[in-house]
């Protein structure tokens, strides 16, 4: 693990020096992830930002949150493709929901430049991405979907967040108990029974396997 961290840290430093941007590296989940990241680094070093974006995008589409952050950085800067605030916000929000704290600054900056209609469109894209991951049985999307309803929507949806935090707790996903309980405090007592029933129904519908730390993703997953 220490060797892998050192390896990735060196790659992050290299990219940052070349780009002058806050590109982030990952603790790759597999040898193939390491190879993909190395290829992206080589592309950046060669000033082939278009190829770097293509490589990062492949990983970003697989919910690798560091790659999503790198997509946001490059697209915000207009490196490799023309500047695109909509796509940069999309990847930035997904990275933020995946636990990349630095992505919050990118999202905040971009929000100041877009119209509310544009932001609404991106919010919908993010929600669709997370919903698709849930439909595909991605247990890591559960807490992110709950967080989405509190931190990305214009008005927090405490009810939906509570439902998914409740499911997360039932599946032994770490650090979800406090989030569920805190969210419960924002819900009227008359709504609790209905929401708990809905949580049980969704829990049975999706039939996720319980969270297994040994099978969980590395730094790329939340």
Where are these regions (language model features)?
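Bacterial N-terminal signal peptides
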Residues: 12-22
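N-terminal leader/linker segments that initiate helical-solenoid repeat arrays
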Residues: 24-55
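Terminal, low-structured helical/coil segments at or just beyond the last alpha-helical repeat
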Residues: 33, 117-138, 175-222
């Amino acid at each position: 693990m220490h060797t892998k961290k050192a390896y990735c840290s060196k790659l992050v430093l290299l990219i940052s020096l070349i780009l002058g941007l806050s590109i982030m590296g990952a603790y790759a989940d597999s040898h193939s992830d390491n190879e993909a990241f190395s290829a992206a680094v080589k592309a950046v070093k060669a000033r082939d930002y278009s190829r770097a974006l293509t490589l990062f995008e492949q990983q970003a589409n697989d919910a690798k949150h560091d790659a999503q952050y790198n997509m946001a950085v490059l697209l915000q800067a207009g490196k490799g493709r023309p500047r695109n605030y909509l796509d940069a916000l999309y990847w930035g929000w997904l990275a933020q929901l995946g636990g990349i704290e630095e992505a919050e600054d990118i999202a905040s900056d971009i929000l100041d430049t877009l119209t509310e209609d544009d932001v609404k469109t991106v919010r919908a894209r993010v929600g669709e991405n997370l919903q698709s991951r849930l439909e595909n049985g991605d247990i890591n999307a559960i807490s992110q979907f709950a967080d989405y309803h509190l931190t990305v929507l214009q008005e927090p949806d405490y009810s939906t967040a509570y439902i998914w935090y409740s499911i997360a707790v039932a599946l032994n996903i770490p650090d979800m108990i406090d989030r569920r309980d805190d969210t419960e405090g924002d819900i009227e007592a008359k709504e609790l029974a209905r929401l708990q029933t809905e949580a049980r129904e969704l829990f049975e519908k999706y039939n996720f396997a319980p969270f297994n730390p040994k099978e969980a993703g590395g730094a790329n997953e939340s």
